[in-house]
């Protein structure tokens, strides 16, 4: 077995690189064709999702295979090899098997335990089978990966450790609130009609949204999805809603208008450019207001007093009414900081800050100095003395300290919630900075998932993966010696046929009954002699390090290498010509 995988994923590369390296359907087909046309690779399959691009191949040379597969990935992704290489990972033989089985179980997903990857692996295998780039090794590998993934989900609680990317994204949008409560009654827009968009629409329907609008470049696909939603969730969607059309389809050019009505939008189109720019989103939320995010000032001051703290005077407040310092130049700054516990606004220089602090603590001498309008060395000396007296009275000496941050003015509550599940992104990242909009995209999901708790069932799945990798390796090593065993039995059959022919020459009067009996007896003797050695050699070959037994068998019986190779090629050709399961 010479299985090699070269790839990159959300674990090895930043989203900015994954976006640029994404492969559309045509690029995947061309990549497969070019891979099997390359010298080191005999089979190939590509697994491309939102969060990973992996090229699997059966190669005869490791280093040449790594170089060729890396070059092909760079060539077809459009990202230069020099830039792409630091983010690539390589797995070989049993490690490659372990990697794919872990991926199939959801252990390597952004949301641990999500089951959508199984469908993507199945599609990957079907694509390779359609192009006849998957032979015996990759057929066995991917089909076993699907079985391992299903076993993990059925025998453990891995589903409780994770969820679909859609559900996780909605949880991030709801900011920790119950998703069903948060979604109930909202109007939803789903952009795209592929598998991820369909899953998003179904998840929103189950969560209890009031209306779902589906937009897609191919209007017929949008209509089909809307019809399915009506059939499956129409009754639930109609609860508490008096509209006649609860799930409907619109063309892509209707998206800007629909976005002005939507409360939540999910986009996953696979487009190469942006579907929603920051300007277009800003235009849709202009004039829409949500619940205020800032509590009333009186409520805040009450909370401060209840906490046992002294409210800090700020620029423009009533507390500044008699302050001798001119704070008008800095009163418009929305954020501030405090020094020595005294309030100040951003924009004060150090001297002004200390004078304001002294006045706030009752520095009447400062007031008198300012009111007198005096200046010069004597006035400065008097001012310094007043500040020193104030410091003595309040029990501390003024000191320079690093400003302590004060929270900026809170953003208004969102009126539009956007979930971008596309790679490359559908929604401009600049939307994160728009007031009134909450955007969750692949990058923010990656950050959030890094802190997600892991379920105990994950350990059980890891044990399943380890056991399945060992079993698969044993089966492959045993299968590797099969062509040699077949060639040995073929040689034995030729020997039997030759000896029977020679016997007929010596005994021309032998009747058919006796000839058949003699032939059968000789065959039984040969089969019995070969049975124990061939069974045992398969067992030995299945063990780690058993690859050498095939060579030993060929040497012992002087088997023709080309005969063995022809048997192997015939088996592989049969697998490649086998259509999707």
UniProtKB/Swiss-Prot annotation:
Protein's pathway: Porphyrin-containing compound metabolism; protoporphyrin-IX biosynthesis; 5-aminolevulinate from L-glutamyl-tRNA(Glu): step 1/2
GO BP, sorted A to Z: protoporphyrinogen IX biosynthetic process from glutamate
Chain sites annotated for binding NADP(+): 192-197
Catalytic activity, EC: 1.2.1.70
Active-site residues, record numbering mapped to chain: 50
Record-marked site positions (Important for activity): 99
Pfam families: GlutR_dimer, GlutR_N, Shikimate_DH
Enzyme class name: oxidoreductase
Reactions the enzyme catalyzes: (S)-4-amino-5-oxopentanoate + tRNA(Glu) + NADP(+) = L-glutamyl-tRNA(Glu) + NADPH + H(+)
GO molecular function, one term: glutamyl-tRNA reductase activity
InterPro entries linked to this entry: 4pyrrol_synth_GluRdtase (IPR000343), 4pyrrol_synth_GluRdtase_dimer (IPR015896), 4pyrrol_synth_GluRdtase_N (IPR015895), GluRdtase_CS (IPR018214), GluRdtase_dimer_dom_sf (IPR036453), GluRdtase_N_sf (IPR036343), NAD(P)-bd_dom_sf (IPR036291), Shikm_DH/Glu-tRNA_Rdtase (IPR006151)
Keywords on record: NADP, Oxidoreductase, Porphyrin biosynthesis
Region (Insert): 292-416
Record bears the keyword Ligase: no
Segments forming a coiled coil: none
NCBIfam families xref list: hemA, PRK00045.1-3
Description of its domains: Possesses an unusual extended V-shaped dimeric structure with each monomer consisting of three distinct domains arranged along a curved 'spinal' alpha-helix. The N-terminal catalytic domain specifically recognizes the glutamate moiety of the substrate. The second domain is the NADPH-binding domain, and the third C-terminal domain is responsible for dimerization.
Function: Catalyzes the NADPH-dependent reduction of glutamyl-tRNA(Glu) to glutamate 1-semialdehyde (GSA).
Additional remarks: During catalysis, the active site Cys acts as a nucleophile attacking the alpha-carbonyl group of tRNA-bound glutamate with the formation of a thioester intermediate between enzyme and glutamate, and the concomitant release of tRNA(Glu). The thioester intermediate is finally reduced by direct hydride transfer from NADPH, to form the product GSA.
UniProt similarity note: Belongs to the glutamyl-tRNA reductase family.
Annotated protein name in UniProt: Glutamyl-tRNA reductase
Originating organism: Streptomyces coelicolor (strain ATCC BAA-471 / A3(2) / M145)
This protein's encoding gene: hemA
């Amino acid at each position: 077995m010479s299985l090699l995988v070269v790839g990159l994923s959300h674990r090895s590369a930043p989203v900015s690189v994954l976006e640029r390296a994404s492969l559309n359907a045509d690029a995947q087909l061309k990549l497969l064709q070019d891979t099997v046309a390359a010298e080191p690779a005999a089979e190939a399959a590509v697994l491309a999702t939102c969060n990973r691009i992996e090229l699997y191949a059966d190669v005869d040379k490791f280093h040449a295979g790594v170089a060729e597969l890396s070059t092909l990935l760079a060539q077809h992704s459009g990202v230069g090899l020099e830039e792409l290489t630091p983010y690539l990972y390589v797995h070989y033989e049993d490690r490659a098997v372990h990697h794919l089985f872990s991926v199939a179980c959801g252990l390597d997903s952004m949301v641990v335990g999500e089951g959508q990857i199984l469908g993507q692996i199945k599609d990957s295998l079907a694509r390779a089978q359609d192009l006849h780039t998957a032979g015996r090794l990759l057929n066995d590998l991917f089909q076993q990966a699907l079985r391992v993934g299903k076993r993990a989900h059925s025998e453990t609680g891995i589903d409780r450790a994770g969820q679909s990317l859609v559900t996780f994204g909605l949880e991030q949008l709801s900011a920790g609130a119950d998703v069903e409560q948060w979604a109930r009654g909202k109007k939803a827009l789903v952009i795209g009609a592929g598998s991820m968009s369909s899953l998003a629409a179904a998840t929103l329907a189950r969560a209890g949204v009031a209306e779902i609008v589906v937009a897609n470049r191919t209007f017929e696909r949008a209509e089909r999805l809307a019809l399915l939603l009506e059939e499956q969730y129409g009754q639930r969607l109609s609860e508490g809603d008096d509209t006649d059309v609860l799930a409907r389809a619109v063309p892509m050019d209707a998206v800007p208008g629909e976005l002005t009505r939507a409360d939540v939008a999910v986009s996953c189109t696979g487009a190469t450019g942006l579907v929603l720019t920051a300007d277009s989103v800003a235009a849709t939320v202009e004039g829409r207001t949500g619940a205020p995010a800032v509590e009333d000032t009186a409520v805040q001051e009450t909370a401060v007093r209840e906490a046992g703290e002294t409210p800090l005077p700020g620029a423009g407040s009533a507390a500044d009414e008699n302050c001798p310092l001119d704070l008008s130049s800095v009163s418009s700054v929305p954020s501030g900081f405090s020094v020595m516990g005294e309030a100040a606004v951003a924009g004060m220089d150090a001297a002004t800050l200390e004078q304001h602090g002294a006045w706030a603590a009752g520095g009447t001498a400062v007031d008198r100095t300012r009111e007198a309008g005096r200046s010069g060395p004597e006035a400065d000396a008097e001012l310094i003395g007043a500040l020193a007296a104030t410091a003595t009275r309040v029990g501390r000496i003024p000191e320079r300290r690093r400003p302590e941050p004060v929270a900026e003015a809170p953003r208004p509550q969102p009126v539009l919630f956007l979930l971008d599940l596309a790679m490359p992104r559908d929604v401009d990242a600049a939307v994160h900075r728009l007031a009134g909009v909450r955007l969750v995209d692949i990058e923010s999901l990656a950050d959030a998932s890094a802190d997600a708790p892991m379920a105990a069932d994950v350990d059980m799945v890891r044990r399943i993966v380890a056991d399945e990798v060992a079993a698969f390796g044993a089966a492959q090593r045993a299968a590797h010696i099969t062509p040699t065993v077949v060639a040995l039995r073929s040689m034995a059959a030729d020997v039997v046929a030759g000896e029977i022919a020679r016997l007929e020459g010596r005994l021309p009067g032998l009747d058919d009954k006796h000839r058949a009996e003699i032939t059968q007896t000789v065959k039984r003797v040969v089969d019995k002699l070969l049975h124990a050695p061939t069974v045992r050699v398969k067992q030995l070959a299945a063990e780690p390090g058993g690859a050498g037994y095939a060579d030993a068998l060929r040497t012992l019986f002087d088997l023709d290498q080309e005969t063995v190779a022809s048997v192997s090629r015939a088996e592989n050709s049969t697998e490649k010509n086998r259509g999707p399961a």
